[in-house]
Amino acid sequence: MHGLTRNARDFAGLAEQIAATRRVIVPEMRGRGMSDYAKVSDSYTPPTYVADVEKLLAEQGITRFIAIGTSMGGLMTMLLAHTQPGRIAAAVMNDIGPEVDAAGLARISGYVGQGRSYPTWVHAARGLAEAHGAAFPDYDLDQWLEMAKRTMVVTQNGRISFDYDMAIAEPFGKPGNAAPPNLWLAFEGLRDVPMLLVRGELSDLLSADTVKQMGVRNPAMQVVTVPRVGHAPTLDELEVRAAITALFDGAA
């Protein structure tokens, strides 16, 4: 499950790897990618996304599953663990925890829903580099181009724009909608679940202290810290892929 402004393309490489041995479903939340935009923007909240996923699971007849969530998708993983106890066989949470740092939320609030567009892919890549260079200080132009093509599309007017409904910003700015104020109770649903936590070394959303507290509540939790990366790792890093493979191999 993807982040706030992201889509299924973030998981293309990882999904291909996992699909060699398991069934994979990579949903795009309402308002992103190929999913319909919501008629009412107030529905762009984590509880609504979780309800959508619960409906998808029911339609597909899925009773037990491994959850992978980046950022907002990790919040959804915790909420699912709370509302669907016993159904998560294992979990990968990418740069997110029960407490979300205010600095990271403020940064996201500064760009979500801005509606920027670009004339070429190179312009789009450079725009991303300008906005997110602090989180990925070692990225070169090719890597920024890859990120641009994951997050943007060519629109009908020929310009390149972000692949989500700009209206997701409307409820995001309201208290409690960006991230529920306290998800420690929901995280308890993952206490006995095999779990991998991925953290960007430079993350401004997931603090080292929160990681430590998560480890106290789930002593079996494995942690991989990706060096010189902020929010959020791509899950394509070699050390992350190896850890995910090990988690899946041990999941019942």
Predicted regions and their residues:
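Active-site glycine-rich loops that stabilize anionic/oxyanionic intermediates
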Residues: 3-6, 71
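Conserved serine/cysteine hydrolase catalytic core
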Residues: 153-216
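Active-site loop/oxyanion-hole signature of alpha/beta-hydrolase fold enzymes
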Residues: 12-20, 25-68
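Conserved alpha/beta-hydrolase catalytic His-Asp/Glu region
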Residues: 119-173
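Catalytic histidine-centered segment of alpha/beta-hydrolase-like enzymes
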Residues: 229-238
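The conserved beta1-alpha1 loop
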Residues: 1-3, 199
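Conserved hydrolase catalytic core segment
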Residues: 63-102
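Short beta-to-alpha linker loops that shape the active-site pocket of alpha/beta-hydrolase fold enzymes
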Residues: 28-32, 97, 227-230
